[in-house]
Amino acid sequence: MIDDRDTYANRERFPGAKEVIAEDFEAAMAHLSPGESSFVVIVTRGHRDDMRVLRWAVQTPARYVGMIGSKRKTIAIFRELTKEGISAERFKRVHAPVGLDIGAVTPEEIAVAITAELIAHRRHAEREMPHMSWFHSHQGEAETEAEDSPVAKTPENQ
C-alpha cells in the first residue's frame, strides 16, 4: 500500500498490509519490482498522480494493472502517455475503470467491486469483461472526446 501522505499510509489504517509505504509515488515506485504475479491497482487522489503511476505500471510485467476513474479521464491519460512514446499496445491489459460493474456507489461498494475483479482475474474467471474494449474499438472517437479533458490540456502540452 502506497500513499504520499503519512496520515493515510500507516500501519494503524492498514494493519494487514504486507508493506505500507508513505512517500512520493515516484520515489516509492523506484523501490518496487512487480513480477508476473503482481497486481497493481491505481487509486490516487488525482489525475496527475494516476498518470504518473500508470506510466510506471504499464512498463512492468505485472499480471494485472487496474486504474480507477472515468472513461474520459482514462482516455486522456492514455493519449498523454502515447504522446510520450508509450505504445498503445501496453494499455490493452489495463482494467479501467477498475472493478466489476455491480452498480457500486459507496466507497465500501467500490472496494468490493475492485476486490471482486481482482479475484476473478486471479482465478482466471474472467469472461468477456468490457474493461478496455470500448477504448480499443473506438480509439479515434475516444481521442476526439478527450480533447476537453483537464489532463489533455495542461500548460506543458498546449
Tell me the role of every PLM-derived stretch.
Residues A62, I68-Q158:
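Adenosine-phosphate binding glycine-rich loop
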Residues R45-R48, S70-R72:
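Short glycine-rich anion-binding loops that position phosphate/pyrophosphate groups of nucleotides
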Residues F25-E36:
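Short amphipathic alpha-helix with an adjacent loop that forms part of the alpha/beta core around
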Residues D49-A62:
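Rossmann-fold NAD(P) dinucleotide-binding segment
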Residues S38-F39, Y64:
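Structural motif
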Residues A17-D24:
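Conserved SAM-binding strand-loop segment of SAM-dependent methyltransferases
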Residues M1-P15:
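NAD(P)-binding Rossmann-fold cofactor-contacting core
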Residues R13-F14, S33, R52-R55, F78-E80:
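Short amphipathic alpha-helical segments
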